[in-house]
């Protein structure tokens, strides 16, 4: 089971303490990983710069690391956010853009020897061929790209 805590609000409507209580509840219910993000990744979301995203996630990461033994994943496509999160002991980066939005993301993840969840995503919703074949090709390319980043 995966727990997703996303801080979508312009201001902190979800406090660190509320996030911790929610995470504890989800772990008690069987969550294996806490996945949190400082920017919504749903279609049409408002862009949040890396500094604001860090302002939102860093206090929560620190509190969760103090209170829980559950692995933490950070949902981000920004290398700066990934780097700072991994420095605090986050175990995995969940990149919904599959390492395509920030050219430094793969090297940051490799530097920390961290886990990564690479999702398929694209700006265009039109596919030249079968959707499953397109996704397979995308993920194969990203696997090869990641492998090269980790083996430099």
Please place each PLM-identified region on the residue numbering.
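Flexible, glycine- and charge-enriched loops at secondary-structure boundaries
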Residues: 12-16, 50-54, 128, 132
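Glycine-rich, proline-tolerant flexible connector loops at the mouths of alpha/beta enzymes
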Residues: 7, 32-59
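N-terminal capping/lid subdomain adjacent to the active-site entrance of alpha/beta enzymes
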Residues: 1-22
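Alpha-helix-loop-beta-strand connector modules within alpha/beta enzyme cores
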Residues: 2, 46-76, 83, 110-117, ...
């Amino acid at each position: 089971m995966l727990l997703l805590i996303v801080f979508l609000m312009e201001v902190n409507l979800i406090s660190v303490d509320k996030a911790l209580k929610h995470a504890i509840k989800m772990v008690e219910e069987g969550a294996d990983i806490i996945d949190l993000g400082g920017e919504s990744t749903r279609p049409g979301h408002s862009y949040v710069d890396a500094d604001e995203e860090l302002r939102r996630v860093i206090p929560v990461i620190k509190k969760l690391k103090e209170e829980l033994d559950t692995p933490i994943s950070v949902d981000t496509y920004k290398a700066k956010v990934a780097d700072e999160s991994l420095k605090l002991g986050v175990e995995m980066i969940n990149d919904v853009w599959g390492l395509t939005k920030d050219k430094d993301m793969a090297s940051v993840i490799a530097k920390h020897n961290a886990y990564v969840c690479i999702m398929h995503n694209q700006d265009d919703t039109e596919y030249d061929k079968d959707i499953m074949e397109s996704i397979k090709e995308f993920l194969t390319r990203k696997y090869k790209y990641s492998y090269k980043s980790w083996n430099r």
